[in-house]
Amino acid sequence: MPVPGTLSVEIPPRYCPLPTARHPDETVLARRTADWIDGFDLELTPQQRARMRGNDCPGFYGRIMPHSPTDRLQLAVDWCTVMFHFDDVHCDEGPATGRAARFADLATRIVRVLEAPDARLEGPGDTMLAPVRDLALRARRWATPAQMRRCAEAHRAWFLAVAWELGHRAARSTPALNDYAHMRQHTAAGAATLAWAEIVDGAEIPDRELSSPEVRALTELAFTTAAFDDDLFSYGKELWVARAEGTAPSGLGLVEILRRENRCGRPEALRAAVCLCNRLTHRFIALRERVLPDASAPLRAYLDHLCHLLPGNLEWGLTADRYRNPDGRTPGAVTTTASRDTDPPADTSPPAIPSIAWWWDPLGGRP
């Protein structure tokens, strides 16, 4: 397959006035996670090891939880490292034929190991279960039973969404924007990512707060906005891979979905995607101001992580090799540039997407 050369994408200005921060021990976290991975027989190729490093999980979680104790944050960084590998190998890449069955088989066993790490499970992909079992056992040193339940359920939601995505890949179909908008938070493992953050924090968020409509709306807003931003970062990768394979870009990304649904060109679709992200960010900030005054200390910590997730993910995504090295063998093949804007968007109304419209009225008209 010929290498298609380099490709550049310029993203229109993203509204995000939230400040960024970095964890001071990201280098330490990176060294420890590399040593941890070496302790398992994952049969990694040199290329896969390079991709693990290039994904920069210390930089990802270090931007979400910049003030967390290093030893505890290591748990989340280790999870991120092995799950990005899982995502690359079993979710995103390679022919779709037969992938769904292999993915489902391994995914169900991963969830079971999180629920019951001492359970004996055998089958294809067993090498992936050893690091997951180690994570589950380490997490139990700090986590409450409710936190471990939330963690397992978050992974189940993630894997269900990936199965939905794999169905579209196998059928070479493009989901409707209305469906994609509410599913994207799950295909991006949003809840799983923050479930580990709660375990790292230690304090359990009261369910009456975490399950309240306004906090649920805030959570979905943050996860979806970050995932849509991932679609912006990965758009160059999608175009590069399509050019290399001589095919049309995948229809499983926000920009392509908007392009096909609105029947417009790629520049117009890219602008529409950024406008949508800007409106979601504005709504998140406005709703956060309503929720924050009455939040408990554990919920405040959770909301702080969400506030760091949005700008941190923007910053991380522009530099992570995950998007710059599209096939794992061509470093720097894709360059994505973007700028941040602190001026609120002109349009802050709910978008015409019924599945997410409730974020603008989480109490259903009640005061």
From Swiss-Prot:
Write out the function statement from the record: Diterpene synthase that catalyzes the conversion of geranylgeranyl diphosphate (GGPP) to cattleyene. Cannot use geranyl diphosphate (GPP), farnesyl diphosphate (FPP) and geranylfarnesyl diphosphate (GFPP).
Q: Which family does it belong to?
A: Belongs to the terpene synthase family.
Q: Which residues bind Mg(2+) 1?
A: D87
Q: Where is this region: Disordered?
A: 325-354
Task: State how changing C57A affects the protein, per the record.
Answer: Widens the active site cavity, resulting in a relaxed product selectivity. Exhibits an increased production of cattleyene and other diterpenes with diverse skeletons
Species this chain originates from: Streptantibioticus cattleyicolor (strain ATCC 35852 / DSM 46488 / JCM 4925 / NBRC 14057 / NRRL 8057)
| Enzyme class, UniProt record, top EC level | lyase
Entry binding sites for Mg(2+) 2? D230, S234
Hey, which pathway is this one from? Secondary metabolite biosynthesis; terpenoid biosynthesis
* The reaction(s) this protein catalyses: (2E,6E,10E)-geranylgeranyl diphosphate = cattleyene + diphosphate
Q: Which protein, by its recorded name, is this?
A: Cattleyene synthase
State the free-text cofactor note.
Binds 2 Mg(2+) ions per subunit.
Pinpoint motif DDXXXD motif by residue range.
87-92
Q: What is its EC number?
A: 4.2.3.225
Q: What cofactor requirement does the entry state?
A: Mg(2+)
Question: Where along the chain is geranylgeranyl diphosphate bound?
Answer: R184, K237, R322, Y323
Organism superkingdom: Bacteria
Outcome reported for the amino acid change (mutating N313A): No change in activity
Which SUPFAM superfamilies does UniProt cross-reference here? Answer: Terpenoid synthases (SSF48576)
Q: What is the effect of changing F60A?
A: Produces only minor amounts of cattleyene
Q: What InterPro entries does this protein's entry cite? A: Isoprenoid_synthase_dom_sf (IPR008949), Terpene_cyclase-like_2 (IPR034686)
Domain commentary: The Asp-Asp-Xaa-Xaa-Xaa-Asp (DDXXXD) and Asn-Xaa-Xaa-Xaa-Ser-Xaa-Xaa-Xaa-Glu (NSE) motifs are important for the catalytic activity, presumably through binding to Mg(2+).
- Motif NXXXSXXXE motif: chain residues: 230-238
